[in-house]
């Protein structure tokens, strides 16, 4: 598998001199398996992914890939209107996600591109979109890869995903909150994984002292507890708070995280690696 971060920021795109190193685009990760392209979330980083696909000669009328949405908060879907391959007839996309308690994924995306919000409505985009709802614990086979979804804790609900191919595995658990106990569902999902990508929106001090309990986000300390319990090899801190500069991330998250688990890293926009 070849993995690339196109968006690592949480909540809102955060451009500027203070976020150049780790990136300002919101959640979007590409995973190229042996035969297929899998995309985790569709934040503002999706625009850059679309440009890369076009430059590489893909998605010009016969392209296909599969999207897996953690949830439908805006920072995880806002890249769809700016995804250039969606404007090319003949391209097709499979969208997977947990049905929202109030509406479907398709309705959420259509509402985002209502004519009062955006000049092109979702239903007018020329590409073909296929929607599939997932239940807790479902596994989807995409070519040589298997993707398993597990429901975690976040306002409105959220899915974590384990992507596995040929004995290698990566777990994506953004926008999840630990509350006062270990989330054993995530431990089970992450068991023996090569990499855990985990929501580290807050420092432990921010989480406790600024009364952010219940906001649906977590800390590096809690993520490392999962890593150790599940026997994960590598830990990636993700969903960076918009208020956290590059310097802050390195000093207040990376340095203390490495003391607890040396193979800890900050997810960085543009970082590409292979499993």
Positions of PLM-derived features:
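Binuclear metal-dependent hydrolase catalytic cores
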Residues: 1-171, 186-187, 251-275
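Active-site flanking residues adjacent to catalytic metal/cofactor-binding acidic residues
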Residues: 40, 70, 174, 198-200, ...
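Cap/insert and terminal regions of metallo-dependent hydrolase folds
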Residues: 178-269
